[in-house]
Amino acid sequence: MFTEDMRIADYDPELSAAINAEKRRQEEHIELIASENYVSPRVMEAQGGVLTNKYAEGYPGKRYYGGCEHVDVAEQLAIDRAKQLFGADYANVQPHSGSQANAGVYLALAKPGDTILGMSLDHGGHLTHGAKPNFSGKIFNAVQYGLNPETGEIDYDQVERLAKEHKPKLVIAGFSAYSRVVDWQRFRDIADSVGAYLIVDMAHVAGLVAAGLYPSPVQIADVTTTTTHKTLRGPRGGLILAKSNPEIEKKLQSLIFPGIQGGPLMHVIAAKAVAFKEALEPAFRDYQQQVVNNARAMADAVKARGYKVVSGGTDNHLFLIDLIDKGVTGKDADAALGRAYITVNKNTVPNDPQSPFVTSGLRIGTPGVTTRGFKEKEVVELANWICDVLDNMGDESVVEKVREKVLSICRDFPVYRANAKSGAAL
């Protein structure tokens, strides 16, 4: 029997210390990793609740266990809200992650050994788009497209040429590090020209799509996948969406369960339902617009300081700084900024001479700082602090000065503000 006053701090001080240190890091450091964000207390409440106790193999109304009448309600809410949010005819909220969602879709629509065409990892694609170390590059014959070296944008002519040459079963559009609007219809036309399915991975821009600030692929692609965190600001998890096609829907349902997963994580699905409801609110669109405004302001400020931005700017929540001409590696820049309490991630850039473990670039994203309340004024300041550190690599006095500024602005813009009634922060 358990009592409600049981706490980790009283039972496991080592773990409690790590959790508290991470809470402190999130409040005191500026988060610029494009795939990270902060969830609301409501999302955390759902994810930390009693639904974690329930096993529920199957789907709402068709479970293999009894006692699922209440979790059925939670999952159906998540499904209905996802469909409403994205204008989809089909939604599966059970994938544990974006990678699981992609795996399920690929295996539902293609066989091992089939050819898939996806964006190269070193040009901005994701591991699951055919990278050699990933399952997608191991069990499928993966062909990769990239960016036009002149524009820094997707080379659609190359995509079309490779599609006609290799006749892929799946054409995969989407990215993990690309700052421009993707022409989903051009991908649709290319896929149709070779009889391929079009799969779109919109994990990075799902929040922008939901807000109507980025073109939606949902009624263009055969299947669309996404994570439920990043710009969508929900729990870590995956989501599959599709336009109406009973044959594809049946394949997707059976491939997720029992194909690659067993029992769904009902507490995470409940948290997804909360996040989807939050994303349906008018304030969510305002938030997403500020995310884009902040990314553009930061990119412009970085360029004004003499740094190269891949493709020259951004249309979404992220941009890439190319450090090749500066003679600075992404690894060293990442570490120096980390000491200044600015968290970014090293990232490969087009024609990168460094290995993926070193790189010559940085990926910068604004979802997290926008959740904190940063607007253009604050992010331009932040961009200049970043450039101060990069201009003075090896000078720890500059790092220290920037760190003090970071701590000050973080105090002014806490992630989790004190409760007006109790006076307690989360």
From Swiss-Prot:
The record marks 229 as: Plays an important role in substrate specificity. Keywords: Amino-acid biosynthesis, Cytoplasm, One-carbon metabolism, Pyridoxal phosphate, Transferase. Its EC number is 2.1.2.1. The gene is glyA1. It catalyses: (6R)-5,10-methylene-5,6,7,8-tetrahydrofolate + glycine + H2O = (6S)-5,6,7,8-tetrahydrofolate + L-serine. GO terms for biological process: glycine biosynthetic process from serine; tetrahydrofolate interconversion. Pathway: One-carbon metabolism; tetrahydrofolate interconversion; Amino-acid biosynthesis; glycine biosynthesis; glycine from L-serine: step 1/1. Disulfide bonds: none annotated. It comes from Hahella chejuensis (strain KCTC 2396). Its cofactor is pyridoxal 5'-phosphate. It is found in: Cytoplasm. (6S)-5,6,7,8-tetrahydrofolate binds at residues 121, 125-127, 355-357. Coiled coil: none annotated. It comes from the Bacteria. The lineage of its organism: Bacteria, Pseudomonadati, Pseudomonadota, Gammaproteobacteria, Oceanospirillales. This is Serine hydroxymethyltransferase 1. One of its GO terms (cellular component) is cytosol. SUPFAM superfamilies: PLP-dependent transferases. GO terms for molecular function: glycine hydroxymethyltransferase activity; pyridoxal phosphate binding. The modification N6-(pyridoxal phosphate)lysine is found at residue 230. It holds the Pfam family SHMT. Catalyzes the reversible interconversion of serine and glycine with tetrahydrofolate (THF) serving as the one-carbon carrier. This reaction serves as the major source of one-carbon groups required for the biosynthesis of purines, thymidylate, methionine, and other important biomolecules. Also exhibits THF-independent aldolase activity toward beta-hydroxyamino acids, producing glycine and aldehydes, via a retro-aldol mechanism. Belongs to the SHMT family. Homodimer.
